[in-house]
């Protein structure tokens, strides 16, 4: 059985509604309602926060000051995303996820987390949602400012559990990130709620982990 790399948002944690709400508040606050949010969100919803905010700044003609972009990238999470999760007590992982973790542990199959989230969100995932029960925080790969893109994140996530991404199964929901997993070298991908027939590396599509065929892992 191959080692496994999990994405988080949209894969282990179904938060599309939370992210859209948080981004809507953030973009409206920055632009004072002058930007067509739905149009820009369609194009940039799967990108890293910094890239999304940078694009908004460009649209508005604002100077691309790194500290200001970082401020808004973090504010989207700490002011809006975190608040929504806590006010609505959103902390349940995707159905079947914890059962899969238990199975992997019992069978001594290495696994790790690879997320484009920033540190502030990783803190929420571990301390509020409870990922600390299942993952080694020191080994996960996230947007700590050292990665150029998710391609390098995938490779690092695999290396930190003693393997290579070419040897792993990746669970991922975003078609953009699935393409990056392929570019990183992964040829064994299980897609969550998304499918592209042109990506031959996708071996199964599931709505959640209760539909997973363990025999293909």
Regions found by a protein language model. Name each.
Residues 12, 111, 170-171:
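Conserved SAM-binding loop
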Residues 96-100, 153-156:
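Well-ordered alpha-helical segments embedded in enzymatic catalytic cores
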Residues 97-127:
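Substrate-recognition element of Asp-dependent hydrolases with the DxDx(T/V) motif
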Residues 14, 113-115, 191:
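Hydrophobic residues in well-ordered beta-strands that form the structural core
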């Amino acid at each position: 059985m191959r080692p496994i790399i999990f994405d988080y948002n949209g894969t282990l944690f179904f938060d599309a509604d939370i992210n859209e709400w948080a981004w809507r508040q953030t973009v409206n606050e920055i632009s004072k309602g002058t930007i067509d949010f739905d149009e820009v969100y369609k194009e940039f919803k799967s990108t890293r926060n910094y890239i999304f905010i940078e694009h908004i700044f460009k649209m508005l003609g604002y100077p691309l000051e790194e500290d200001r972009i970082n401020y808004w990238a973090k504010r989207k999470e700490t002011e809006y995303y975190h608040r929504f999760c806590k006010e609505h007590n959103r902390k349940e992982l995707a159905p079947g996820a914890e059962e899969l973790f238990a199975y992997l542990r019992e069978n001594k199959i290495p696994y790790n987390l690879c997320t484009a989230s920033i540190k502030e969100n990783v803190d929420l995932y571990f301390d509020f949602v409870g990922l600390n029960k299942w993952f080694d925080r020191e080994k996960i790969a996230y947007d700590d400012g050292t990665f150029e893109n998710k391609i390098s994140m995938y490779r690092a996530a695999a290396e930190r559990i003693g393997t290579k991404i070419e040897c792993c199964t990746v669970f991922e929901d975003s078609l953009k990130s699935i393409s990056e997993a392929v570019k990183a070298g992964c040829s064994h991908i299980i897609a969550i709620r998304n499918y592209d027939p042109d990506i031959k590396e996708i071996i199964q599509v599931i709505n959640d982990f209760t539909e997973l065929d363990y025999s293909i892992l």
